Amino acid sequence: MDSGAQRVSAELPPLLRVYEDGLVERLVGSGFVPATLNDPQTGVSSKDVLISPESAVSARLYLPKLTCNRRKLPILVYFRGGAFCIESAFSFLDHRYLNILVNEANVVAVFVEYRRAPEHLLPVAYDDCWAALEWVSSHSVGRGANYEPWLTDYADFDRIFLGGDSAGGNIVHNVAMRARAQSLPHNL
């Protein structure tokens, strides 16, 4: 065996490989794409925000092309799939999907980037997504210390929706059950 070769301690084909030194190699997934202003195909703008500096939970916000009608838009808090261990809110496929979804649904979207397994085991993803929902709801009272203008200026906090695919659907269920048991800030 090559002295420089690392030994595999666990594999989850075709998704990932974990080495004895703790390195995680993700075998599938699409690459990172930056946020865009005025996507050429949809007119949707996006930007990245840090929700929690302590846990590094972040999100990509999406805003549809604005019309002269300044009516506030529904909010979609979206959780990605990927078996809790692959993909990202910043991946090409998910970015493309959210651009189309936001354009068609005419919503402000918050696409949560939660920490992935196996580095961060459940319930970390649930807690990260709950923190993101609390962050969104904290904007319902206006411009606080950590406010995001796309939410305070364009979002209707009487119309918040949760969505997700695959593992994200599981997170939607968990977060909705938690919202029933615990109150969100400002009674949302």
Question: Which role fits each region the language model picked out?
Answer:
Residues 131-188:
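Primarily recognizes the serine-hydrolase "nucleophile elbow" in alpha/beta-hydrolase
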Residues 71-83:
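Short beta-strand element of the alpha/beta-hydrolase
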